[in-house]
Curated annotation (Swiss-Prot):
Keywords, comma-separated and alphabetical: Cytoplasm, Polyamine biosynthesis, Spermidine biosynthesis, Transferase
Location in the cell: Cytoplasm
GO biological process: spermidine biosynthetic process
NCBIfam families given in the database record: MFS_SpdSyn (NF037959), PRK00811.1 (NF002010), speE (TIGR00417)
Name of the protein described by the UniProt record: Polyamine aminopropyltransferase
Catalyzed reaction equations: S-adenosyl 3-(methylsulfanyl)propylamine + putrescine = S-methyl-5'-thioadenosine + spermidine + H(+)
Main localization, broad class: cytoplasm
Stored Pfam families: Spermine_synt_N, Spermine_synth
Gene: speE
Domain PABS, first and last residues per copy: 5-238
Residues that, per the record, bind S-methyl-5'-thioadenosine: Q33, E108, D140, G141, P165
Enzyme Commission identifier(s): 2.5.1.16
Length: 286
């Protein structure tokens, strides 16, 4: 791809977004997918897989703070955390900020993503790959959760959209495996697309997760480069109470953790679980 051209995302057929490409840092097919990292004056370094934006330097903090701090602070005493995907290292970065976490296991199917992101997106991991609590496993996520002897308090599925390598992370086999290796009272969260445009994805996840967990819902965050509306995150647990913790409890845990965030705060935590009526209606209808 030539520099000073436009890169167009291919996620949707009828409309989309584009980025001006100031400088292509890397473009190659890995063992599993087409990966490009380029520079854009407005959003910094941008990574896309198979024609779909995965992360940008400018707005990644919103996604990663909400995927980590919501479940970890809701749980309150998570010691063992599993990240599925997350090869850019930013999810790991946010989990390492929780000093009570004792082990962090990250399962990434594509070793190339980890290698390239360490080189070209160093601010994403911010040195977290060197944290002594961290273990990297190169494996398929479905295989890992169904075979591991480890158990976890929080599982974060930082998956791509349900196409290509990410498709298996939206299956019943994956959700069943996550339930298998989740400790009692544990929490599973996963990115679930932009609900206004990808509502079927959310409904499918809700239907499948409900076979394994007693409390299944969603929470949301506005992330500019995941365009088309509010980003939806799946939430699943057997502890029905932790989705309804008091603001005082979340506030106390937030201060005790010593976190300083750019997007997440205790008020955002509570508000994120308020869902639009069209999603409530769709869930009720299925």
């Amino acid at each position: 791809m030539a520099e000073n051209t436009m890169w167009h995302e291919t996620l949707h057929d009828q409309f989309g977004q584009y980025f001006a490409v100031d400088n292509v840092l890397y473009h190659e097919k890995t063992d599993h997918q087409d990966l490009i990292i380029f520079e854009n004056a407005a959003f910094g370094r941008v990574m896309a897989l198979d024609g779909v934006v995965q992360t940008t330097e400018r707005d990644e903090f919103i996604y990663h703070e909400m995927m980590t701090h919501v479940p970890l602070l809701a749980h309150g005493h998570a010691k063992h955390v599993l990240i599925i995907g997350g090869g850019d290292g930013a999810m790991l970065r946010e989990v390492t900020r929780h000093k009570n976490v004792e082990t962090i296991t990250m399962v990434e199917i594509d070793a190339g993503v980890v290698s390239f992101c360490r080189q070209y997106l160093p601010n994403h991991n911010a040195g977290s790959y060197d944290d002594p609590r961290f273990t990297l496993v190169i494996d398929d996520g479905v295989n890992f959760v169904n075979q591991t002897h480890q158990t976890f308090d929080v599982i974060i599925s930082d998956c791509t959209d349900p196409i290509g390598p990410g498709e298996s992370l939206f299956t019943s086999a994956f959700y069943e495996g996550c339930k298998r290796c989740l400790n009692p009272g544990g929490i599973f969260v996963a990115q679930n697309g932009v609900c206004f445009l990808q509502q079927d994805e959310a409904l499918d996840s809700h239907r499948k997760l409900s076979h394994y967990f007693s409390d299944v819902s969603f929470y949301q965050a506005a992330i500019p480069t995941y365009y088309g509306g509010i980003m939806t995150f799946a939430w699943a647990t057997d502890n029905d109470a932790i989705r309804h913790l008091s603001s005082e409890t979340i506030q106390a845990r937030f201060h005790a953790a010593g976190l300083k965030c750019r997007y997440y705060n205790p008020a955002i935590h509570a508000a994120a679980f308020a869902l639009p009526q069209y999603l409530h209606d769709a869930l009720s209808a299925q």
